[in-house]
Amino acid sequence: MNILFDVLNIYYIPQYFPVWRELKKRGHNCSLIVYSKKNDKNLLASTLENLDISYTWVHDDSEAKDLYLTQKPDWIFFGNEFAFLDEIHQKSKTVQMGHGVGPKPSYYRKSDTPMTVRFMEGEVRLKKIEEMYPKDKFVQVGFSKLDPIFDETEQGLDLAKLGLDPSKKTILYAPTFNPTSLGCFPKNWPSEFSEYNILVKVHSLTLSRDRYKKDQERIQAWKQYSNVYVAGVDEFSLVPFLKTADVLISEASSTLFEFAALDKPVVICDFYDLKWSYKGIFKYRFAKRFGADSVIYKELGAHAANYKKLKPIIQDEIENPKNYKNNRRKYNIDHVGPTDGKASIRIADYLENN
């Protein structure tokens, strides 16, 4: 089979990669289609080369559509909606597979334009989306992004090579893009957590857009501390960081589900800033994007009401990692699905059988 993966954003690749790996192992022809309008071509070219994956650049979805209609692949994977499905479906079958399992209603609404099949993660999510779109095809497979951790092919980070102390416990701080707690952390916060390694993995947009200079300056200040490693924009995969860390700090990211699926403690920041587009007269946008019907993190792990309360909570979660074990197990079944490292195998089986 000829199978293409639509890479609107570079952070789709960690979700696609385990599936690409399984399909290549079975002898299928696979390639990434990467959008230069959304991704820095110069910055990412060497990263894509290092992945040893075949790829083609297109400017936007219109150019991608033309390529798909010309190549007529058997299957095309999408991480979001796509505007030209009526034309595409005359030539190819399509897959929708989200890059995260976060709380945004858009997780469900991207199925407003149905694809041939959508691969789903947990039981609750499957049930909900089947109720919303009873005529469409959904198949529960799990969360392929985490397969390399569960099948133990992901080795994680070498802390010593990063200049960190392997004898220390490691915190992963992975703030969301919007809302974000990033601005609520002082420039000297690594000094207050000196007994820990700190891995900082922020959204690629925060690092790459000029409008976020203040955030970038704050991150650069953290980078100067010997117990901190800040991931570069080229390190688009969170998976090695998830594998390595002992505890996660975030606020509204699907990373919370992913880390909890590894049965490791998460600490949820109830303090954060909103971008201007969600403030004042635009606050309705925030309610719409994180609506009352969306998934919440209320019982997934410990919550910190403000920055000052964060450290004792971190310490308690590291010393008592079983605090929320039962909650994590339930969230995992409901939202992430099977954690046997075989989501990609189930996906490949489905494509071959259909």
What are the residue ranges of the model-derived segments?
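C-terminal alpha-helical cap of glycosyltransferases
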Residues: 339-354
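A nucleotide-sugar donor-handling region in carbohydrate enzymes
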Residues: 114-183, 207-208, 323-330
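Active-site and donor-binding regions of nucleotide-sugar-utilizing enzymes
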Residues: 4-152
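Donor-nucleotide binding loops and adjacent catalytic segments primarily
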Residues: 165-244
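A donor-sugar binding/catalytic signature common to diverse glycosyltransferases
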Residues: 76-78, 88-96, 233-282
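Structural alpha-helical scaffold elements that stabilize or flank donor/cofactor-binding regions
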Residues: 67-69, 111, 192, 240-241, ...
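Short acidic-hydrophobic, aromatic-tinged amphipathic segments that line or gate anion-handling sites
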Residues: 55-60, 229-233, 299-310
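Catalytic binding pocket for nucleotide-activated donors in carbohydrate/polymer assembly enzymes
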Residues: 140, 254-335
